[in-house]
Curated annotation (Swiss-Prot):
Principal subcellular localization: periplasm
Record organism: Sinorhizobium fredii (strain NBRC 101917 / NGR234)
Membership in a protein family: Belongs to the bacterial solute-binding protein 2 family.
Protein name from the UniProt record: Probable ABC transporter periplasmic-binding protein y4mI
One of the record's GO molecular function terms: carbohydrate binding
Keywords: Periplasm, Plasmid, Signal, Sugar transport, Transport
Signal peptide: 1-18
Cellular compartments per GO CC: periplasmic space
Function of the protein: Probably part of the binding-protein-dependent transport system y4mIJK. This system probably transports a sugar.
Cross-referenced InterPro entries: Peripla_BP_I, SBP_2_dom
Length: 324
C-alpha cells in the first residue's frame, strides 16, 4: 500500500511540476505588436506577413494595429499595445516626423522597437533597430537607369512620382536620384508627391505630368502603384515603350507589366524581409542577443530578361507572400 501511495505521490508531483513548467513557459512567451501606417496598402500587409511569420518561428504571439495614416492614431496604438502587455513593437510609421514622441514614450516603457520600411526622424537614436532599403544608393541606381531610359528614347527630361517627402526613405531616394540625374545629364522637370499611394492617384498625377511636360522621356516611380498608374496612362495615350518607366518595390502587378514590357525595370524592396528582420532584432533585444541597429537592405534591379531566373525568384520570396 505504501508503494502505491508513493507512486501516486510521485505521479502527482510530476503532474504539478509539468503544470508549473507549462505556466512558466506561457509566462515566458513574448508578444510582438505590428503597427502599420495603413493596411489598405499591399506593401504594409506584406511587412506584417513577415513579422507574423518570424514571430511564429520564434515562439512569439502576434498582434497588429493600423494607424490609418494618422500620427495621433499611431500614438494611441502604441499606448494600447503597451497597456495590453506587448513586449516589443515593429512599426511602419505614418511618417518619419511622427516618430519622436512615439520613441520617447516607448523608451519610458522599456519596449524595444524596430522600424520597417520607413526609418525614424533623422537624429533620433532611441530605437532598437531600423530595417529599411538602402534608399540613397537605390535612388542613385534607379536615377541612372531612368536617365538611360530617357536617352535611349531621344531625350533627357524625366518626371518623378514620389513618396511623401516627410519620410526619410523618400528623402534619401530623391537625394540619390538627383545626384544621378546631375551626373548622367538628365533633367528632373517635375516631381509630384503621393498622399494616398493609390493607382488612381498615380494615374491622375502621371496624366498631369505628361500634359505639362510632353517632352518627358522616362518616369521614375518611387513606389509600386506609381509604376502601375504610369503604365496605364502610357497605354491610354498610345505611348507604351515610347516613354520609359522604372519603379521601386515590386508586386505581382508590376511583375506582369515588366514581362509585358510596359515597364522596363523594378528595384525590388523586401517588404516581407523587412518584417522578418525587424522581428528578429526586437526578439534579440528581449533575449539579450546582439542587435543590429541599422540594416539597409539592397534593392536589386530586375529587368524583363532576368525576371524568371533563380536569383530573381529568391529576391521575390522576400518581397511578397507566396500566395500573391
Amino acid at each position: 500500500m505504501r508503494k502505491k501511495l508513493n507512486g501516486w505521490l510521485a505521479m502527482a508531483a510530476g503532474a504539478a511540476l509539468a503544470a508549473l513548467s507549462s505556466v512558466s513557459h506561457a509566462e515566458d512567451r513574448k508578444t510582438v505588436a505590428y503597427l502599420a501606417p495603413s493596411l489598405d496598402i499591399s506593401y504594409w500587409q506584406w511587412v506584417g506577413f513577415g513579422v507574423k511569420q518570424k514571430a511564429q518561428e520564434l515562439g512569439m504571439d502576434y498582434v497588429e494595429f493600423t494607424s490609418e495614416n494618422s500620427p495621433a492614431k499611431q500614438m494611441d496604438n502604441a499606448r494600447t499595445a503597451v497597456t495590453k502587455g506587448v513586449d516589443a513593437i515593429v512599426i511602419g510609421p505614418v511618417s518619419s516626423t511622427s516618430t519622436p514622441p512615439l520613441l520617447a514614450y516607448l523608451k519610458s516603457q522599456n519596449i524595444p522597437i524596430a522600424f520597417a520600411g520607413i526609418g525614424p526622424q533623422p537624429g533620433q537614436t532611441d530605437y532598437t533597430s531600423s530595417v529599411t532599403a538602402n534608399n540613397y544608393e537605390t535612388g542613385k541606381a534607379q536615377g541612372s537607369f531612368v536617365c538611360a531610359l530617357a536617352k535611349e528614347r531621344g531625350g533627357n527630361k524625366v518626371g518623378m512620382l514620389s513618396l511623401p517627402q516627410d519620410r526619410e526613405n523618400a528623402q534619401k531616394y530623391l537625394k540619390g536620384a538627383q545626384e544621378a540625374f546631375a551626373a548622367d545629364g538628365c533633367e528632373l522637370v517635375q516631381m509630384l508627391e503621393t498622399r494616398g499611394l493609390t493607382v488612381n492617384e498615380a494615374v491622375t498625377q502621371a496624366n498631369d505630368m505628361l500634359t505639362a511636360h510632353p517632352d518627358i522621356k522616362a518616369i521614375y516611380g518611387m513606389y509600386d502603384e506609381a509604376g502601375t498608374g504610369a503604365a496605364k496612362v502610357l497605354e491610354t495615350r498610345g505611348l507604351t515603350g515610347k516613354i520609359g518607366i522604372a519603379v521601386a518595390d515590386g508586386s505581382p502587378t508590376t511583375i506582369a507589366l515588366l514581362k509585358a514590357t510596359a515597364i522596363q525595370g523594378i528595384f525590388f524592396q523586401e517588404a516581407v524581409g523587412q518584417g522578418i528582420d525587424g522581428t528578429l532584432q526586437v526578439f534579440n533585444a528581449l533575449t539579450n542577443a546582439p542587435v543590429e541597429k541599422d540594416l539597409a537592405l539592397v534593392m536589386p534591379l530586375v529587368t524583363a530578361d532576368k525576371i524568371d531566373t533563380a536569383e530573381a525568384k529568391a529576391v521575390i520570396a522576400r518581397v511578397f507572400p507566396p500566395s500573391n
